[in-house]
C-alpha cells in the first residue's frame, strides 16, 4: 500500500466499469481489480456487476476468506471521497391496501350447510307422501 493515500471521486471510479478497466469500492477503499478479472472464482460478471456503486455489501455477502482479503491489498489504489458517493436508497415496498377477503363465499357455504339438509328432508317427505299406499 502506498504511503500517501490518493483520494478519488465517485464519478471517476464509476467510469472504470469494463472488463479491461474495472475498479471497485469496498469499505471506502478503491481497488483496481482489472488484473484479477480472469482469476476471480465467480467470473468477471460478478465483479462487473459491482462497479459504479459501493460494493461493500456485495463483497461481504459472499463471505470472502482472510486470504482473499489479503489479496485485495495489491489491488488497492486509493480512498473514495465519501462526500461524492450517492446515498444508498433503501427499498420501500409499495403501499398496499389491507387484505379484505370477500365474505360472500363463507356466507353462502353456511347457508347451504343449513338449507341442503332441510331440502333433502323435505324432498324425502314429499316422496314418501306420494309413494304412500292408501
Swiss-Prot record:
<protein>
    <recommendedName>
        <fullName>Cytochrome b5</fullName>
    </recommendedName>
</protein>
<dbReference type="GO" id="GO:0046872">
    <property type="term" value="F:metal ion binding"/>
</dbReference>
<dbReference type="Pfam" id="PF00173">
    <property type="entry name" value="Cyt-b5"/>
</dbReference>
<comment type="similarity">
    <text>Belongs to the cytochrome b5 family.</text>
</comment>
<feature type="domain" description="Cytochrome b5 heme-binding">
    <location>
        <begin position="5"/>
        <end position="81"/>
    </location>
</feature>
<dbReference type="InterPro" id="IPR036400">
    <property type="entry name" value="Cyt_B5-like_heme/steroid_sf"/>
</dbReference>
<keyword id="KW-0249">Electron transport</keyword>
<keyword id="KW-0479">Metal-binding</keyword>
<feature type="transmembrane region" description="Helical">
    <location>
        <begin position="107"/>
        <end position="127"/>
    </location>
</feature>
<keyword id="KW-0472">Membrane</keyword>
<dbReference type="InterPro" id="IPR001199">
    <property type="entry name" value="Cyt_B5-like_heme/steroid-bd"/>
</dbReference>
<keyword id="KW-1133">Transmembrane helix</keyword>
<dbReference type="InterPro" id="IPR018506">
    <property type="entry name" value="Cyt_B5_heme-BS"/>
</dbReference>
<comment type="function">
    <text>Membrane bound hemoprotein which function as an electron carrier for several membrane bound oxygenases.</text>
</comment>
<keyword id="KW-0349">Heme</keyword>
<keyword id="KW-0408">Iron</keyword>
<keyword id="KW-0813">Transport</keyword>
<keyword id="KW-0812">Transmembrane</keyword>
<dbReference type="GO" id="GO:0020037">
    <property type="term" value="F:heme binding"/>
</dbReference>
<keyword id="KW-0256">Endoplasmic reticulum</keyword>
<dbReference type="InterPro" id="IPR050668">
    <property type="entry name" value="Cytochrome_b5"/>
</dbReference>
<feature type="binding site" description="axial binding residue">
    <location>
        <position position="64"/>
    </location>
    <ligand>
        <name>heme</name>
    </ligand>
</feature>
<feature type="binding site" description="axial binding residue">
    <location>
        <position position="40"/>
    </location>
    <ligand>
        <name>heme</name>
    </ligand>
</feature>
<keyword id="KW-0492">Microsome</keyword>
<dbReference type="GO" id="GO:0005789">
    <property type="term" value="C:endoplasmic reticulum membrane"/>
</dbReference>
